[in-house]
Design a protein with these regions (language model features):
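AAA+/SF3 P-loop NTPase mechanochemical coupling elements
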Residues: 132-140, 171-189, 237-244
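Conserved C-terminal "switch" segment of AAA+ ATPases
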Residues: 24-25, 133, 191-201, 205, ...
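The Walker A (P-loop) glycine that initiates the GxxxxGKT/S ATP-binding motif of P-loop NTPases
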Residues: 75, 112, 143
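Conserved catalytic/switch belt of AAA+ P-loop NTPases
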Residues: 143-179
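Walker A/P-loop
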Residues: 69-101, 130
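Short, small-residue-biased leader/transition segments that mark boundaries at the very start
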Residues: 2-6
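AAA+/P-loop NTPase substrate/partner-engagement loops
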Residues: 91-120, 128
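Pre-Walker A (pre-P-loop) alpha-helix and adjacent loop at the N terminus of AAA/AAA+ ATPase modules
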Residues: 15-19, 23, 30-74
Length: 261
């Protein structure tokens, strides 16, 4: 009967809570030299972006807590915003999860459903804590500027506010307040003007400029090509790229921002 269903769901909620290691929000120091090495190894140029990330590391080392504000990376498509987000998670030595706001159009996807329903389940956010097995977690929020509701239901952007305000997050399935002091959000967006003011106020904005033609050439030869060759099992001396060939590729992709062509 309904009682058995509710009992099973209550047991599941309890097992999820017991599975998560609830950590203190004391944060160990991060080596800024190692952080810089990680950034330089994966990112070409972007000096101002790297500097902002190192400043965040220094702030963490000073306070031994995560900053009150997350990072919002704003720029055209293909400029490496998601890659930067993953690198920050790597530098912080924290597990990470992604929320793709372009595919979330109903707040219940984030908050879960009430246990009064037989098909009830926790929301994406609670499942992320469960998968990570700990409460210190980087949330990489892709396309924050798409965090709106398209079908009249509660706005997912409002739910994100409760995740980011450090007062605790309520999942309808769990029926209790989830501590969020160990949550660090890193969001990406193409257009910050489409993000609500309350949500925008939770982030330090870092602008990611598009690459120049010369920068795209360097990135292709020194970063993209070696990675592709390694993936398909070729040595660099087995693939010769002529200047004319590279120019032809860039001309073909001239209407595309970034390097995602």
């Amino acid at each position: 009967g309904l009682g058995d269903v509710y009992k099973r769901q209550a047991q599941r909620a309890l097992s999820i809570m017991l599975n998560i290691k609830w950590k203190s929000n004391y944060f160990e120091s991060i080596d800024p030299v190692e952080a810089r090495r990680i950034l330089d190894e994966e990112l070409f140029g972007m000096e101002s972006v790297k500097q902002r990330i190192i400043e965040t590391v220094i702030q963490i080392n000073r306070t031994h807590t995560l900053p009150a504000y997350g990072i919002l990376l704003v720029g055209p498509a293909g400029t490496g915003k998601s890659q930067i987000a993953y690198l920050v998670a790597k530098i912080l030595k924290m597990p990470w999860t992604t929320l793709d706001m372009s595919s979330i159009n109903d707040a219940e996807q984030l908050t879960g459903s009430s246990r009064i329903y037989s098909n009830a389940k926790p929301g994406i956010i609670m499942e992320a804590f469960n998968m990570a097995g700990e409460s210190n977690l980087v949330f990489i929020i892709n396309e924050l500027d798409k965090a709106t509701s398209s079908n009249g239901n509660a706005n997912p952007a409002d739910v994100l506010l409760t995740l980011l305000d450090n007062l605790g997050f309520t999942d309808n399935y769990m029926e209790c307040l989830i501590p969020t002091s160990g949550v660090y959000p890193i969001a990406t967006a193409n257009d910050k003007d489409k993000i609500s003011a309350p949500l925008l106020s939770r982030f330090a904005v870092i602008d990611i400029p598009d690459y120049t033609r010369e920068e795209k050439k360097t990135i292709f030869l020194k970063y993209s090509l070696p990675k592709v060759l390694k993936r398909i099992g070729l040595h660099e001396n087995e693939c010769l790229v002529l200047d004319d060939g590279l120019d032809a590729v860039l001309d073909y992709c001239k209407d595309t921002t970034g390097i995602s062509c």
